[in-house]
Amino acid sequence: MTGVQTCALPISTQYGYGSENAKFDSDVAQQIMDAIVDLAQRQGLDYHPSWANEDKYEKSNKASVKLDWNINEFNKFSIRWSYVDAKRNLGLGSISSLYTTNHLYEFQSKTHTLAAELQSRFSPSLNNEARFSYVRVRDQRTSGAAAPSIVVSNVGKGSVGIGNEGYSMANGLDQDVYTFEDNLTWLRGSHAFTFGTHNEVYKFTNLFLPNLYGAYTFNSPQDFFDVVNGTADGSKIASYAVTQIGRASCRERV
């Protein structure tokens, strides 16, 4: 028995550059982008971001195969395999936020599942069930070109984000789970005695380097242009925020 399924779900269009009723100021946003491109060129970098104007989407491809085999009247064997490939794009803008294309990221999750079972009957009072399974999961975020995250607030009544999304610059999780279980059941009168074992082996690889290429946050366009033009007041004290809920983070506001 086999099965294949494909699903694609487009969702409403985000607000983009020049969108009507958007709270951010598109003209000021373009000035900020032009200043960043000019700064990159002066540093010898070829960096040309563009404004994002994409639909949000969710896609998935699924496939499965199952085989049942009656070996004989005392033994039955089954094996099944399933596969799920799911994708969705995140990091889109809103009515009050405008982002570049490399701020968007695609979250992709691929899962393979393999399971096998052997049922054996040795006598009217003695039977055995053996099971094995393997689950392979690969979760990954696909980010844009290597570039820092630059966020400027109070651009009109919204904010502008240029560069990569801070938590997607290096983010991935690999999981491999092996399971073996065997149960021998002995029927004795009105009683059933089960002797067995259950074993699981896990392997995880987690990549998470937030703000790998750097992150810069500005309270206003004027603060941003002051830094770019070298006219910022260096006597200001930087503010920090530290939190601890399972992890610690530190952010600097310029």
Region spans (language model):
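Short, small-residue-biased leader/transition segments that mark boundaries at the very start
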Residues: 2-9, 252-254
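Glycine-centered secondary-structure boundary/capping sites
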Residues: 3, 16-19, 36-46, 141, ...
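Surface-exposed beta-strand-turn/loop segments characteristic
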Residues: 11-59
